[in-house]
Amino acid sequence: MKKIDVTEAIILAKKERNLTWEGIAAELGMGTVWVTSACLGMNSMPEAVAEKLCAYLELPEGAKAALMEYPTKAWDKEVPQDPLIYRLYEVVGVYGDTLKEVIQEKFGDGIMSAIDFTMDVAKEENPKGDRVVLTLNGKFLPYKAW
C-alpha cells in the first residue's frame, strides 16, 4: 500500500465518521498539526502511533507499514491555486526578507530548523473578524565557519 492510498483511506474514514484532525490527534495523544501532516503523507509515524491510528480508523492491511515509511518531502514548485495556501506563499513573498533580517538581527547568521520544530494553529476571536494565529517554533541553527 502506498502513502497516497493510506491518505485517501484516512480522509474517507475521517469523513464517514465525522471526525476532526484535532479529535484524531487527541485519540493518538499527539499534536494536531503533526498528525495531520503525517496522515497527509509528509511525516512518518512511530509504530505505536501508526498501530493506534489504524485501529481507530479501521484502516486496511498495509496501512501501518505505509504510515511508518519515510516520506519524500517534496512538493510542486508552482505556486498553488488554493487561496489559503497561496496566501501563505504571499506572506513569505512579501515578508520573507523582513523575517530573515529580523531573525538574523536577533540570532545571528543561520536558519530556523524545520526538523527540531513544532507548529500550532489557533483561532483568536476578534470583533473585526476572527483571526488565524500560526505559531512556527523552530530551533535556531547558526551557520558555522570552517
UniProtKB/Swiss-Prot annotation:
EC number(s) reported in the record: 4.2.1.104
Entries under InterPro entries matching the protein: Cyanase (IPR008076), Cyanate_lyase_C (IPR003712), Cyanate_lyase_C_sf (IPR036581), CYNS_N (IPR048564), Lambda_DNA-bd_dom_sf (IPR010982)
Molecular functions (GO terms): cyanate hydratase activity; DNA binding
Keywords attached to this entry: Lyase
Residues annotated as the enzyme's active site: R87, E90, S113
Catalysed reactions, as listed in the record: cyanate + hydrogencarbonate + 3 H(+) = NH4(+) + 2 CO2
Top-level taxon in the UniProt lineage: Bacteria
GO BP terms: cyanate metabolic process
Keyword set includes Lyase: yes
Protein family membership: Belongs to the cyanase family.
PANTHER family found in the cross-reference section: CYANATE HYDRATASE
Annotated function: Catalyzes the reaction of cyanate with bicarbonate to produce ammonia and carbon dioxide.
Protein name: Cyanate hydratase
